[in-house]
């Protein structure tokens, strides 16, 4: 293993329309085959729809949706004496955002609406109202962590 300096994380450029780094990251997660302009168009259309529905500012509604999907704890597998335990660990802030965005995009892709922009808008509006697949995913992860709280002392 090389012992050179640790390379820092790349700085992500904020998105051009709203100037938000979170939104730029979200666009990158949604992007398929390097088609960034298509991903941006989908996200901006979805945010327009979301803002009209919720009556909030675009970014504010997006933040609320993300907040409702962010996990605080998750489980990680840990081998102890030949058996594997699901150990609950706290999620780092950067990973919280990444997981929330990934779950929202995955849930939107699984929906049956016409366009991706509409699917994303519906999933985001569900997340704002604390319902939908992405919120259910977070609750499942929290439930797993709660069920395995007895193994918390195996944290590393």
Swiss-Prot record:
Question: Do you know which InterPro entries this protein is assigned to?
Answer: Ribosomal_uS7, Ribosomal_uS7_bac/org-type, Ribosomal_uS7_CS, Ribosomal_uS7_dom, Ribosomal_uS7_dom_sf
Per the record, the domain of life is Bacteria
What is the name attached to this protein's record?
Answer: Small ribosomal subunit protein uS7
The entry's cellular-component GO terms read: small ribosomal subunit
Q: Does the keyword Transit peptide apply?
A: no
Q: Which Pfam families match?
A: Ribosomal_S7 (PF00177)
Question: Which PANTHER family does the record match to this protein?
Answer: RIBOSOMAL PROTEIN S7 (PTHR11205)
- GO BP, sorted A to Z: translation
Q: What keywords tag this UniProt record?
A: Ribonucleoprotein, Ribosomal protein, RNA-binding, rRNA-binding, tRNA-binding
Task: State the protein's purpose.
Answer: One of the primary rRNA binding proteins, it binds directly to 16S rRNA where it nucleates assembly of the head domain of the 30S subunit. Is located at the subunit interface close to the decoding center, probably blocks exit of the E-site tRNA.
**Species of provenance:** Serratia proteamaculans (strain 568)
Please state which protein family the record places this protein in: Belongs to the universal ribosomal protein uS7 family.
MF terms in GO: rRNA binding; structural constituent of ribosome; tRNA binding
In terms of Gene3D superfamilies, this protein maps to:
Ribosomal protein S7 domain (1.10.455.10)
Q: Does the keyword Glycoprotein apply?
A: no
- Give the record's subunit note: Part of the 30S ribosomal subunit. Contacts proteins S9 and S11.
